[in-house]
Amino acid sequence: MKNLRNRNFLTLLDFTQKEMEFLLNLSEDLKRAKYAGIEQQKMKGKNIALLFEKDSTRTRCAFETAAYDQGAHVTYLGPTGSQMGKKESTKDTARVLGGMYDGIEYRGFSQRVVEDLAKYSGVPVWNGLTDEDHPTQVLADFLTAKEVLKKPYNEINFTYVGDGRNNVANALMQGAAIMGMTFHLVCPKELNPTDELLNRCNDIADKNGGEILITDDIDEGVKGSDVIYTDVWVSMGEPDEVWEKRIKLLEPYRVTKELMKKTGNPHTIFEHCLPSFHDTETIIGKQIQEKYGLTEMEVTNEVFESEQSVVFQEAENRAHTIKAVMVATLGE
């Protein structure tokens, strides 16, 4: 724990394989302790600011419950709860919050903002999501895969199907490279990740005994997969023309029962960071149905509700893994 004390958690690329393993192992320990009712508070009296430019269910609840479990106090600043970017610069906000709080979580748009918060606040800063990255999500994804598959991380064949430029896809590729996994990214060529990120991840994977495959061939990409992972195709606020183009590109990559069978592995599990457009039981789901005639988007309801789906175990693990990050970087 001491070697990560006062460290920021901005991107997985800042961490070694041993450091990632430590965080994942600590997550398991903290989860067991919580279930057994023997958790020890390592953050008693600490004050934490949660700075959200984007609303969230899982990230907010995970940070809040993890902090409370560990004896810390939380202030939530939502999209209209601070002056950052409006009447006050990120640099000034960082220095204000750094003088009052022991740690800061940021969930928003720009990776540059979370980096500036870390640069100027003087306290640990944790990335709860940016447009480019989502490192806390990956810890939960990997922990869940290990729990269910009962395999060491470097033996897991992890496949992401969908938008290859997505922040979760970026973060998963980084994490898989660091952990020495086999990672397949199955997506249309138009949605491949940047060459810069791919080259960096390939270099890391080579050093750690991992392998990365980028392909638009679904059969090739999913073969042998232990995990099939997807995320939403579009984000709220993107213009209609983006939705239409993205849906047309990605509709062949919807995760269906047939796609799951193509893995040839009867033990393949399905993961998703949530929320998911797998039915029409939401306002957005109904709008998608009315506008595009679709009742399911990135995954069918059949797969989402199947025994192969571990999405709610994965969601719970957000709290345990986020707790590990905070305890490791801030705990006594």
UniProtKB/Swiss-Prot annotation:
One of its GO terms (biological process) is citrulline biosynthetic process. It catalyses: carbamoyl phosphate + L-ornithine = L-citrulline + phosphate + H(+). It is found in: Cytoplasm. The keyword Transferase applies. InterPro entries: Asp/Orn_carbamoyltranf_P-bd (IPR006132), Asp/Orn_carbamoylTrfase (IPR006130), Asp/Orn_carbamoylTrfase_sf (IPR036901), Asp_carbamoyltransf_Asp/Orn-bd (IPR006131), Orn/put_carbamltrans (IPR002292), OTCase_ArgI (IPR024904). Keywords: Arginine metabolism, Cytoplasm, Transferase. GO terms for cellular component: cytoplasm. Carbamoyl phosphate binds at S56, T57, R58, T59, Q83, R107, H134, P135, T136, Q137, C273, L274, R318. It holds the Pfam family OTCace_N. Pathway: Amino-acid degradation; L-arginine degradation via ADI pathway; carbamoyl phosphate from L-arginine: step 2/2. L-ornithine binds at N167, D231, S235, M236. Its EC number is 2.1.3.3. It is an enzyme of class 2 (transferase). One of its GO terms (molecular function) is ornithine carbamoyltransferase activity. PROSITE patterns: CARBAMOYLTRANSFERASE (PS00097). Belongs to the aspartate/ornithine carbamoyltransferase superfamily. OTCase family. Reversibly catalyzes the transfer of the carbamoyl group from carbamoyl phosphate (CP) to the N(epsilon) atom of ornithine (ORN) to produce L-citrulline. This is Ornithine carbamoyltransferase 1, catabolic. It comes from Staphylococcus epidermidis (strain ATCC 12228 / FDA PCI 1200). The lineage of its organism: Bacteria, Bacillati, Bacillota, Bacilli, Bacillales.
